[in-house]
Amino acid sequence: MDHLNEATQGKEHSEMSNNVSDPKGPPAKIARLEQNGSPLGRGRLGSTGAKMQGVPLKHSGHLMKTNLRKGTMLPVFCVVEHYENAIEYDCKEEHAEFVLVRKDMLFNQLIEMALLSLGYSHSSAAQAKGLIQVGKWNPVPLSYVTDAPDATVADMLQDVYHVVTLKIQLHSCPKLEDLPPEQWSHTTVRNALKDLLKDMNQSSLAKECPLSQSMISSIVNSTYYANVSAAKCQEFGRWYKHFKKTKDMMVEMDSLSELSQQGANHVNFGQQPVPGNTAEQPPSPAQLSHGSQPSVRTPLPNLHPGLVSTPISPQLVNQQLVMAQLLNQQYAVNRLLAQQSLNQQYLNHPPPVSRSMNKPLEQQVSTNTEVSSEIYQWVRDELKRAGISQAVFARVAFNRTQGLLSEILRKEEDPKTASQSLLVNLRAMQNFLQLPEAERDRIYQDERERSLNAASAMGPAPLISTPPSRPPQVKTATIATERNGKPENNTMNINASIYDEIQQEMKRAKVSQALFAKVAATKSQGWLCELLRWKEDPSPENRTLWENLSMIRRFLSLPQPERDAIYEQESNAVHHHGDRPPHIIHVPAEQIQQQQQQQQQQQQQQQAPPPPQPQQQPQTGPRLPPRQPTVASPAESDEENRQKTRPRTKISVEALGILQSFIQDVGLYPDEEAIQTLSAQLDLPKYTIIKFFQNQRYYLKHHGKLKDNSGLEVDVAEYKEEELLKDLEESVQDKNTNTLFSVKLEEELSVEGNTDINTDLKD
């Protein structure tokens, strides 16, 4: 195998001798770097001129063998073919290089990661198409090799990497916004999201783009169960083009306002009388700073002393100034309206900082974008001054959770070396702290009032005072008993591999980060996202991290069926608690029993004629409950009545889009695993999703097409029974049996109640 590998590498390197001998690298790569303005240069892995110049082939083969023995990397021979456009397939330039890729990387990301390793931009990688060739066979697309979304590079290329050539067709399209919506794919959407997340966080991006926050997180982290549908990709492409165009217009408006202010200062300077012979005076530094060419600013002898070589009428200058002011006012009003509609003011457009006109424009821009290293101390001082909690500050400053803010303050990462997502959060906090103190206090007060109103709307009693109907008691009891076992912390195996186990567990169970963080560590989705991003080395000295990872390790040590049951119970609990009205959550059990007794009395009055003495009817109320435990206890009947009000049957427009994408990708007959995945992703009960698919199958069979919902919410409770194409499943039969049994039970109770009434009357 090693001999064949060296022979193949020698053959391929001999074919690349022309490119290797060129110290500047392939011309296609140089043109691409100059066109996209990539700062990567040729210092990256894919730089032929910098990396392979003067390096013997035997040494490079030895390096590849060393990496292979470690078992983490695989060499892949790539041939990049550069086309002028996507229609005319005239190959202009091509070059070939080896790329080292991770074995555990997904196979469908091979093209993208190979181009990024070679130094190409995200937009170029998103628009590329790849073919794989084994030996001298005809090259085929990667999708023809396997359609498994979880297939890795090691699964597909472990045994044939030495005879495999990856041919990448790169079309010249300068920007993603210039790409037609029909050509958008799952890869282009993921790269566009990565580019957008450099300037904003996921929550603020989800408020603007047609994708939800959970879907954005899944696509970026490559945990989405399937590729985004073509319709969703086209919708995102249209939105991305409009978003970029609007952003460019705002940048142009800002630059126009800067130029108008500079022009106003220049006109005021030019209207001042200049003593002496101005034709002999050199241009002043102020004039040179406003002009691009010094010769233009030199006044001519035959002109008025205060004018430039190309005079501008004051009328035109005034018109430009008025137009700039109107545009600035319109921009400010639009931004104010957007801030009021978002409930979170300072995420997308930070408040403008007053710029001093005596500073150069480059310095002004840099001071606005830089984050001070004192930001962490500023936040602590602000928390002490205002007397607010970390949760309130995290919500109003950068719209995240208290757990994420606590982790940021604990680590105190240097802003100069911080990641893009952390920089976005730090910049948002810094922009918020630059507001006046009175404005910040007003925002804190508004947030407190909003929280109090939300709490009062839920009822006077806390949620924990409700009857113990929350299903995930198995999880809490199990973890609570394990928490008491203190000696387990010393023997527990906690190392850096726990982060990979967390990702594998979420992928296996098809659960979201929010659900896993809640059941495993009682944390938020933002906390888990930051934990997986930093992947800090576990150490008992870091007590907070060690305790959180210990909780996760205890949860992962549970048997797999028990973990799946906890996921299911927690998902159902979220549905149930979200669907119960506030007046039902906090009503005491005694009052509910009295209401049930009154309802049963009314039913008895409707079924049987009232007795001649109505004043004795209330005495029958207390006699009914003693007979109920013989069939069903009051707590069980109370639970049944609550379960009837809990289920959610409405499907939002966003969930409809995901379901329609699933129909286009998979079909109208999802299996149990797919239904469970959709239920967890859309936060909907399973029977709601089942009814939706049954209704769609009915319309396809009887009308020849799927039902058009016209972008409106759908309530599956409004579906008629004849509009559901379904088989008699066991769950449906059990439900019908329970319904018939409950009807018979009510009839028996009513008969017994009437018998008691007649007996009392006779007595």
Curated annotation (Swiss-Prot):
Residues 71-172 form the CMP domain. Belongs to the CUT homeobox family. It holds the Pfam family Homeodomain. Keywords: Acetylation, Chromatin regulator, Chromosomal rearrangement, Disease variant, DNA-binding, Homeobox, Host-virus interaction, Intellectual disability, Isopeptide bond, Nucleus, Phosphoprotein, Repeat, Repressor, Transcription, Transcription regulation, Ubl conjugation. Residues 1-15 have a biased composition (Basic and acidic residues). Residues 266-296 have a biased composition (Polar residues). SMART domains: CUT, HOX. It is linked to Den Hoed-de Boer-Voisin syndrome: A disorder characterized by global developmental delay, moderately to severely impaired intellectual development, poor or absent speech, delayed motor skills, and early-onset epilepsy in many patients. Most affected individuals have feeding difficulties, poor overall growth, dysmorphic facial features, and significant dental anomalies resembling amelogenesis imperfecta. More variable features include visual defects, behavioral abnormalities, and non-specific involvement of other organ systems. Developmental delay with dysmorphic facies and dental anomalies: A disorder characterized by mild global developmental delay, impaired intellectual development, walking by 2 to 3 years, and slow language acquisition. The severity of the disorder ranges from moderate cognitive deficits to mild learning difficulties or behavioral abnormalities. Most patients have dysmorphic facial features, abnormal dentition and non-specific visual defects. DEFDA transmission pattern is consistent with autosomal dominant inheritance with incomplete penetrance and variable expressivity. Changing residue 29 to A: Loss of nuclear localization, cytoplasmic. Expressed predominantly in thymus. It comes from the Eukaryota. A motif (Protein interaction) lies at residues 139-143. Residues 175-248 form the CUTL domain. Crucial silencing factor contributing to the initiation of X inactivation mediated by Xist RNA that occurs during embryogenesis and in lymphoma. Binds to DNA at special AT-rich sequences, the consensus SATB1-binding sequence (CSBS), at nuclear matrix- or scaffold-associated regions. Thought to recognize the sugar-phosphate structure of double-stranded DNA. Transcriptional repressor controlling nuclear and viral gene expression in a phosphorylated and acetylated status-dependent manner, by binding to matrix attachment regions (MARs) of DNA and inducing a local chromatin-loop remodeling. This is DNA-binding protein SATB1. It comes from Homo sapiens. There is a cross-link at residue 744 (Glycyl lysine isopeptide (Lys-Gly) (interchain with G-Cter in SUMO)). Changing residue 530 to Q: In DHDBV; stabilized DNA-binding and increased transcriptional repression. There is a cross-link at residue 51 (Glycyl lysine isopeptide (Lys-Gly) (interchain with G-Cter in SUMO2)). Changing residue 32 to A: Loss of nuclear localization, cytoplasmic. Changing residue 744 to R: Loss of sumoylation. Residues 224-278 are annotated as: Nuclear matrix targeting sequence (NMTS). InterPro entries: CUT_dom (IPR003350), CUTL (IPR032355), HD (IPR001356), Homeodomain-like_sf (IPR009057), Lambda_DNA-bd_dom_sf (IPR010982), SATB1/SATB2 (IPR039673), SATB_CUTL_sf (IPR038216), SATB_ULD_sf (IPR038224). Gene3D superfamilies: Homeodomain-like, lambda repressor-like DNA-binding domains, SATB, CULT domain, SATB, ubiquitin-like oligomerisation domain. The record marks 254-255 as: Cleavage.
